[in-house]
Amino acid sequence: MKVRASVKKVCRHCKVVRRKGVVRVICKDARHKQRQG
């Protein structure tokens, strides 16, 4: 899980999702997981 000021899609499988006011990137590649912090 990377914590970043700006989250971006890395590949075509990435999805930007908003959960409880936190912007996240979920992907089938676990290395692409990100959270906005």
Swiss-Prot record:
Organism name: Nitrosococcus oceani (strain ATCC 19707 / BCRC 17464 / JCM 30415 / NCIMB 11848 / C-107)
Keywords per UniProt: Ribonucleoprotein, Ribosomal protein
Similarity section: Belongs to the bacterial ribosomal protein bL36 family.
HAMAP family: Ribosomal_bL36
PANTHER family: 50S RIBOSOMAL PROTEIN L36, CHLOROPLASTIC (PTHR42888), LARGE RIBOSOMAL SUBUNIT PROTEIN BL36C (PTHR42888:SF1)
Keyword Ribosomal protein among record annotations: yes
Superkingdom in the source lineage: Bacteria
A Gene Ontology cellular-component term: cytoplasm
UniProt cross-references to SUPFAM superfamilies, sorted A to Z: Ribosomal protein L36 (SSF57840)
InterPro entries found in the cross-reference section: Ribosomal_bL36 (IPR000473), Ribosomal_bL36_sp (IPR035977)
GO molecular function annotation: structural constituent of ribosome
Protein name per its UniProtKB record: Large ribosomal subunit protein bL36
Single GO BP term: translation
Pfam families: Ribosomal_L36
